[in-house]
Amino acid sequence: MVTAEKSRIDCRHIDVLDGIRAVSVIIVLIFHFWQQTWIFPVIKTPWLASVGITKIDFSNFATVGYLFVDMMVLISGFLLFLPLMRSIILGEEMSGWKNYARRRIARIVPSYYFAVLLLFFASALPTGAYATTADALKDLFAHLTFTQTLWVNTYIATPLDVVLWTVAIEVWFYVLFPFVAEFIKGPRNKNRQSFTPAYGIFFIFAVFNIINYVYTENFVLKGNVYLAMRINQFPAFLGVYSIGMLGASAFVLIAKNCRRSRIFNAVNTLFSVCSILLIIYLINDCVATQERQVWQVTERSKLAFVFMTFIITTALSSKWYRWLFSNKFMRFLSGISYNLYIWHQWLAVQCKNTWRIPKWSGEIPPNMLNITYWMNRYAVVITVFAFAAAILATYLIEKPFANLIMGRPVFPLFAKKLLKTANSADEECINEEESAPLSAEVDSFADTVDSDKPAENAAANPWGEQETDRNDSDCD
């Protein structure tokens, strides 16, 4: 029997997003690794031979894994709009835009700037990657201002990290979002009754999709254009963000008006599985077409809608099914996914072409000669390097600097140990007045550390994404 408290749908911390984001980043990683290794991800299943299944082939996901960058962008948009929809539908109070900007900076900037500056000064400049000083300064300026997608030589041809373009797309939507949110909320005066948030939502949805359509038809599909340069510009993702907005409003409405039950959970589990099958169908359809980039841009909104359906139904599914996407391992992967996305491709390329790890000689890379033992060793090396870099960058750069920006202890574990030490000292201290200053100082640390818990932190900062949220980015 489900209690009233357990039957409520949590629209603050959506635990399954950890796993969905992690899986999306891993699929993008598989795509980039496949480009370098030429190894197709095929799992042999001799134990299933009796039922006619001798292997599970993920090759199609490898060849068009870049499509899951859209999933990362969609998750980002969904989470951005979620607090706004809670405010409109549930009447929750929102914190100010200053806190919003602070959280966005804390989440994005430390790891991103670290990667840009390290690669520029430690790799690109020493290796003479730029023809002129002007080219170098332009590339650096474009990346520091998140405008690298505007020029070919700072985007596709950059000697820095190409995958950082997705971060730039998200940052520009972060900049746009406050204006969109204020418009949706409507005027704060007596005329508010004539302009409800629902009108604002549908108006923004229409405007975003019109811009997306006009851009696609006139700047992507018409004429002799460089598709790779056009399909991932900011206007091409407005349709995806609009679907994230509708998904957030739908999810909060469901959370307000529905309660969990065995039948409710089971039905959503079934719909989630059907969504996965539909995603597989769309992936196969993309692989089957000759113009995959054209398919990507023309079917982007359709794919985003299926992704959104998968996200919502998975979040509303049965507990055992949600656990697949919200267990500790998935939370760990989600925690390092931003830096995993940032570093995986650059390290893979450097290992093969610059450092030649594993060792090889000659002019033709071993994967092009189908030297399988080298290809397998190389796949292991770049996987280890990517995860090692992600873990180090997350716990030595991203989290400490994010804590610093948010006014939290830079190293929370140290603060907790300090608290334990102070408590022990308090017990042994004869003079309570002498121990009070230290105890008060450490208690303030403890309050800050404890506020890092996902549910409590979401309540205190409704504009912030859930604490385990990482992009990506993917995203992508």
Question: Which residues are covered by each model-predicted region?
Answer:
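C-terminal "closing" transmembrane helix and its immediate cytosolic amphipathic cap
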Residues: 1-9, 31, 321-330, 345-447, ...
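SF2 DExD/H RNA helicase N-terminal ATP-binding lobe
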Residues: 454-459, 463-467
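Membrane-interfacial segments
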Residues: 84-92, 122, 126, 130, ...
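Functional transmembrane helices that form membrane-embedded active or gating regions
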Residues: 5-26, 63-64, 97-102, 108-109, ...
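Outer-pore turret/helix-boundary of cation channels
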Residues: 128-139
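Juxtamembrane loop-helix boundary motifs flanking transmembrane segments in multi-pass membrane proteins
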Residues: 5-8, 52-56, 89-97, 101, ...
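Aromatic-enriched alpha-helical transmembrane segments of multi-pass intramembrane proteins
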Residues: 138-168, 173-303, 351-358, 363-385
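Kinked, hydrophobic transmembrane alpha-helices enriched for aromatic residues
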Residues: 11-84, 102, 106-128, 145-154, ...
